[in-house]
Swiss-Prot record:
Protein name per the record: Exodeoxyribonuclease 7 small subunit
Gene name for this UniProt entry: xseB
An MF annotation (GO) of this entry: exodeoxyribonuclease VII activity
A GO cellular component entry from the record: cytosol
Keyword annotations: Cytoplasm, Exonuclease, Hydrolase, Nuclease
Transmembrane segments: none
Compartments in which it is found: Cytoplasm
Enzyme kind, highest EC tier: hydrolase
UniProt source species: Rhodopseudomonas palustris (strain BisB5)
Disulphides: none
Amino acid sequence: MADAAPADVKKLSFERAMEELETIVKRLEDGKVPLEESVAIYERGEALKRRCDELLRQAEARVDKITTDAQGKPVGTEPLDVQ
């Protein structure tokens, strides 16, 4: 399996990638997919999972916490520590 996601996967939004991943999981869980097709859609599922992980990391990096002064007025932002 290649390390890089196929070009079409790299263009998907988080929501679209997650929707397709859920469809793949349902098909695999159903157990009615031939072996060769199962392997192919499993590999696509892995690429979709990597895409979702990448987009989540990007979103997390952009989330900021609003900082306030002593009176509670917003004065800026700083990275949100989600840990």
